[in-house]
Every structure is written in C-alpha cells, then in structure tokens.
Regions:
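Conserved beta-strand-loop-alpha-helix junction that forms the acyl-donor binding cleft
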Residues: 9-11
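Vicinal oxygen chelate
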Residues: 1-6, 26-130, 140-152
Length: 152
C-alpha cells in the first residue's frame, strides 16, 4: 500500500520551487496543460495540482486559504538541521521551532521496530513549517525509543 497525497496549490511554480529547494523533492513528471506535477523524495510521493487550473477536481466544499487545515505531513529526513537551515534561508514560515520531543507510548506494541512492553517514549528532532499555501510539514529525525521518564 502506498499513500500519495494530492495537494491543491495556488501557484504551481511557487510550490515546485518550495518543494524542490526546501524539502528536496524532485519532479518526476508534469502535465503542464493541467497545471499538475508529480514529486518524489526518498520514496515519498506527492502530487501538486494548481487549484484554478484546468485539471480534474475532488472537492467537498469551497477551497479557502490557508489550505490543508487540520493536517500536517511528517517527513523523515536524514538531516533535519539542514532542512531547517534551508527553511530559514528560504523565508518560509516556521510554525514550531526546532525541538527534541518525546512522545509517550501507552500500550504494548510488537511490530517492526516497535517492540514495546512497558512505559516507553519515542523521540523526534523536528520542527513544523508552512508551505506557500499553508500546508504544514513536520520534517524530523527519528531519535529512537527509550524507557519512559517517570519524573515528568
């Protein structure tokens, strides 16, 4: 199973510049007549469609800015600090400053790297930024799993 989000954007060129320069996505292909692009970054695939362009639409309500309310996209990267530096240099809006954050895991899990039997935390070095249309992205580096800190 592969999940490939398609995001409506106001200006395809501005969005392509942002995704290529800040988040290092590469353009796999474009359908210029439809104002559409298909992007990829280390196995993560993403589609962009210009909202006012002639392409096909899947909407349940009028589109209002900022787009993407109620969702953020978490993107695992090798060097979150480099992504943060590019974000600052680009002038993109940083919503949550870079941080190390540990999240509690309340239940036992046994799947893949998640071998959790007691009170545990999973950590990220992360920040949240907004793309030109207001979609929120959370680049992060996985800090691993540790026993929960009972002093918190």
């Amino acid at each position: 199973v592969v999940l490939v989000p398609e995001l409506d954007v106001r200006a395809l060129e501005a969005s392509l510049h942002f995704y290529a320069e800040v988040l290092e996505f590469r353009i796999l292909f474009e359908r210029s007549a439809e104002r559409f692009a298909y992007l990829e970054h280390d196995g993560v695939e993403l589609m962009l469609q210009e909202a006012a362009g002639p392409g096909r639409r899947f909407r349940t309500a009028p589109l209002e800015s900022p787009y993407g309310r109620g969702v953020n996209f978490q993107l695992c990267v090798a060097d979150v600090d480099a992504v943060h530096t590019r974000t600052v240099s680009s002038g993109a809006k940083i919503v949550v400053p870079i941080e190390e954050r540990w999240y509690p895991i309340d239940v036992a899990v046994s799947a893949g790297r998640w071998q959790v039997t007691g009170p545990t935390e999973v950590g990220n070095r992360q920040f949240v930024l907004a793309d030109p249309d207001g979609y929120l992205w959370r680049p992060f580096r996985d800090l691993g799993i540790r026993p929960a800190d009972d002093s918190a």
